[in-house]
Amino acid sequence: EEQVNVPFLPDERAVKCIGWQETCNGQLPCCDGCVMCECNIMGQNCRCNHPKMTSECGSRR
């Protein structure tokens, strides 16, 4: 399977990226709609593990 770099890929087949971002940094656009996401250092490969339910990225409550 050929892997392509995409800004957002909420899929189990998404490549596990380097540089685990458990919460949004505010500097990674791939984490805009996620509370938990995986992104590489460049922010090229990202996967949303848990979509945010609030308007603030990083809010856990």
UniProtKB/Swiss-Prot annotation:
The keyword Secreted appears for this protein: yes
Subcellular localization(s) per the UniProt record: Secreted
Lineage top rank: taxon: Eukaryota
Primary location class: secreted
Family matches, as SUPFAM superfamilies: Agouti-related protein
Manganese is among the record's keywords: no
Domain notes: The presence of a 'disulfide through disulfide knot' structurally defines this protein as a knottin.
Function: Potent toxin that may paralyze and/or kill insect pests such as H.virescens (lepidoptera), S.exigua (beet armyworm) and M.sexta (tobacco hornworm).
Protein name listed in UniProt: U1-plectoxin-Pt1b
Native organism: Plectreurys tristis (Spider)
